[in-house]
Amino acid sequence: PEFLEDPSVLTKEKLKSELVANNVTLPAGEQRKDVYVELYLQSLTALKR
């Protein structure tokens, strides 16, 4: 899969599905989009480097 340098262009739902698809545990409850963007950067964009 292709990991974005700037995941904030994705919708919140898309961010969540990408995280789940890569076995990243989502925080409980509904979070603000930037929480998922941060998770994406830490978990997925970091893997690419």
UniProtKB/Swiss-Prot annotation:
The keyword Acetylation does not apply. It comes from the Eukaryota. GO terms for molecular function: DNA binding; hormone activity. InterPro entries: LEM-like_dom, LEM/LEM-like_dom_sf, LEM_domain. SUPFAM superfamilies: LEM domain. Belongs to the thymopoietin family. Hormone of the thymus with pleiotropic actions on prothymocytes, mature T-cells, the nicotinic acetylcholine receptor, and pituitary corticotrophs. This is Thymopoietin-2. It comes from Bos taurus (Bovine).
